[in-house]
Amino acid sequence: MKYVKSIFAALLFTVVLSIGAFAQSAPKVIAVVNQADWCSVCKGNGQRALGAFMENNKDGEISLVVNDVTDAETKKKSAFELQKLGIIKAMKNYEATGVIYFFDAKTKKPITQITVANSDEEIAYVISKVKRAVR
């Protein structure tokens, strides 16, 4: 059952990434969520937080990338995506799991961060604040 849930979660994240890629070719903000299969905060809050993120990012201004740090293999796959976006160096300072880190897409500088354990309202507030910061 855990394997099925992991497959489902991976599929959901892939769909979210694909939607973000088609919604806007040049996002103003890159959001990176560090997650791992062993992270209890991620397991308990990840799907709810992802739903809150999607609900508040219908315009696609923020591109979401999942940085899966479960093991060496998932880290390698995630590193490829981070490298494509030019934020792999910036992410070296942000390694905590269960956290969404927001970066300016042009400068690659950090804007803010929030844990996936925060409420939907707090996540919505941070997303609106981030969008205003890059306008």
What spans do the regions from the language model cover?
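Sec/Tat signal peptide C-region and signal peptidase I cleavage site
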Residues: 19-23
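Thiol-based oxidoreductase modules, predominantly thioredoxin-like and allied folds used
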Residues: 59-79
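Short, internal strand/loop/helix patches
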Residues: 78-106
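Bacterial N-terminal signal peptides
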Residues: 9-18
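Conserved redox-active cysteine motifs that mediate thiol-disulfide chemistry
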Residues: 34-48
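Conserved helix-turn-beta segment immediately C-terminal to the redox Cys motif
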Residues: 26-28, 47-66
